[in-house]
């Protein structure tokens, strides 16, 4: 169970009003997020004696503290763990390591950030009318959530046959030598389908329209792969199974309106992700896709002192290990920035 960890200086103000206490809170560096990027940044900054504060949120981005990784049942590709472990277990270990080195972890959700002046200001959920907390630097590591279809049966079989990451989950035993399906019409869908052919008996790609949005080169690769079957003008209607694992997908041809049951043991969504950037919207440069724009090879953004790490700025890889590396980069960038301000 995740506990609320508060640094000692936050417990010595008994009797002081909430508004006065709020005015007194200033952090040298603040990390917003609770996934691999956030905790890796916290570990590096804490070991460098930068006294980081990490706001892990209550239900940030619709996910409990720990981020998207907590929805993954088995992780087999994170270095150092030859025996697979769950996403929740991995994040609990990272959290303990952050706390061990002195990170001030606060289980509150940051709901508003003001980057217009220094120090930066932030407010937490249910405290928007209070005096803001101030901070000299911010690392935003709020991640991105996979877009879901919300099909009937989806909640029952989420991570029990339904996933939004083929690279993360495609190799697990329940998918090996089984028919699988991918929903999407872009490059991501084609890439995931091609990846899944390493493990599946065959892979269906369900495309809503009568053509791909994918690049020509990706389309050619799909056409040449004998283990991939493309179903154009096709939508999914319902996920079915035995109550434990997915084994069927109800589909419909949008031209003929004919419905059928498609036998599949895995369904992968490849319809995009939504980066959690609402709290800084309009204050920092973003890519056209909504991801925070960073200087290549760094976590630097258009606002000095404001850094972005993990999936909130990575629209391509979105892996736990790449997020962790990004968190390390952000910590080093923030440390250099703060040292230069002294």
From Swiss-Prot:
The keyword Transcription regulation does not apply. It comes from the Eukaryota. Transmembrane segments: none annotated. One of its GO terms (molecular function) is thioredoxin-disulfide reductase (NADPH) activity. Its EC number is 1.8.1.9. Keywords: Disulfide bond, FAD, Flavoprotein, Mitochondrion, NADP, Oxidoreductase, Redox-active center, Transit peptide. InterPro entries: FAD/NAD-bd_sf, FAD/NAD-binding_dom, Ferredoxin-NADP_redctase_2, Pyr_nucl-diS_OxRdtase_2_AS, Thioredox_Rdtase. One of its GO terms (biological process) is removal of superoxide radicals. NCBIfam families: TRX_reduct. PANTHER family: THIOREDOXIN REDUCTASE 1-RELATED-RELATED (PTHR48105). Homodimer. Belongs to the class-II pyridine nucleotide-disulfide oxidoreductase family. This is Thioredoxin reductase 2, mitochondrial. It comes from Saccharomyces cerevisiae (strain ATCC 204508 / S288c) (Baker's yeast).
